[in-house]
């Protein structure tokens, strides 16, 4: 009887442990790069992995993996919105009001607003024109190339810039090369890598030397609006806040900023600060230095804010 009771007890203990052992890791499937030279999202997926690792003891194992086929942003958002039927379940994008209605946002600025500091790729004759410009109104005489689905397309339009729209990221580089528009607005975090990747394909392509546009444009993680998405969002936010509390988030951000801005000289540029009409009240207060970077050291001392 004692042996039978002991066997029964062991059996119960083993059965109780099985669900935890057999539980499937939480999967995070994101879009792959648009091409082999596209490194724009590497930092964000590394931050995601660090956040998930930070609370592994609380939430269990996880898998972070790219989907096998590239997709543009419109398709990626639709796939996440499809929930269980979607081929991916997480994207990292600059937020806007419409996107926050469709998807579940985790409202923590992953790059502390760095994406909202914008510079231009231009052709030589455009730089010559810009050398003689001083005001925002003069800058607005030129056309800016944008993808129709990008968040800052609405921001720039609301600030009365002239836009030339396209649906293809690579196509915008080609259009600039044949002078279909004047300015290709790119984040300070991405412009140098993009210039390196395209300068040999587009003779004369250069990074504009004089101006910066700035507006608060945080990049968030987005997941489906369903039960699984809520579990994902809870875990991601918990992990990001753990990273912030430990100082790991700031360490990673500073290393990332140093890397992406290493070959750019921001000091001495004229900064035009614009309003972001697409920023919801979910965003952290703009004076919260934990989640926003004003780039004061990089823009000082010779920077003069445009009026």
Language model region names:
Residues 25-41, 132-149, 182-183:
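Short loop->beta-strand "edge-of-pocket" segments that line small-molecule binding or catalytic clefts
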Residues 104-114, 201-215, 263-270:
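Short beta-strand->loop
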Residues 118-134, 216-234:
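A bilobed periplasmic-binding-protein/Venus flytrap-type ligand-binding module shared by bacterial periplasmic
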Residues 138, 143, 147-231:
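Pocket-lining segment of extracytoplasmic ligand-binding domains
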Residues 108-154:
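A conserved helix-loop-strand patch within extracytoplasmic ligand-binding domains
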Residues 7-16:
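Bacterial N-terminal signal peptides
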Residues 23-102, 236:
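Extracytoplasmic small-molecule ligand-binding "clamshell" domains
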Residues 239-307:
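An extracytoplasmic/periplasmic, membrane-proximal ligand-sensing/linker region
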């Amino acid at each position: 009887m004692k042996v039978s009771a002991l066997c029964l007890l062991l059996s119960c203990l083993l059965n109780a442990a099985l669900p935890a052992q057999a539980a499937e890791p939480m999967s995070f499937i994101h879009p792959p790069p648009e091409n082999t030279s596209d490194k724009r999202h590497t930092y964000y997926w590394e931050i995601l992995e660090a956040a998930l690792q930070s609370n592994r003891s609380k939430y269990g194992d996880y898998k972070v993996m790219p989907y096998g086929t590239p997709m543009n942003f419109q398709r990626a958002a639709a796939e996440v919105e499809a929930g269980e039927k979607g081929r991916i379940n997480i994207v990292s994008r600059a937020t806007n009001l419409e996107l926050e209605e469709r998807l579940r946002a985790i409202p923590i600025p992953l790059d502390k607003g760095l994406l909202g500091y914008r510079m231009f790729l231009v052709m030589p004759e455009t730089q010559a024109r810009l050398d003689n410009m001083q005001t925002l109104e003069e800058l607005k005489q030129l056309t800016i190339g944008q993808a129709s689905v990008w968040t800052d397309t609405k921001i720039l339009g609301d600030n009365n810039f002239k836009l030339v729209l396209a649906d293809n990221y690579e196509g915008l580089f080609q259009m600039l090369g044949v002078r279909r528009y004047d300015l290709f607005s790119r984040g300070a975090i991405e412009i140098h890598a993009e210039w390196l990747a395209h300068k040999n394909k587009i003779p004369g392509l250069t990074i504009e030397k004089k101006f910066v546009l700035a507006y608060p444009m945080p990049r968030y993680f987005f997941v489906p609006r369903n039960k699984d998405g809520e579990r994902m969002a809870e875990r991601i936010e918990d992990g990001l806040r753990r990273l912030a509390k430990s100082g790991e988030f700031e360490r990673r951000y500073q290393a990332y900023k140093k890397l992406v801005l290493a070959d750019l000289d921001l000091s001495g540029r004229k900064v035009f600060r614009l309003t972001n009409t697409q920023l919801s009240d979910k965003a952290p207060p703009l004076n919260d230095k934990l989640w926003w970077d004003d780039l004061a050291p990089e823009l000082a001392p010779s920077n003069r804010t445009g009026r």
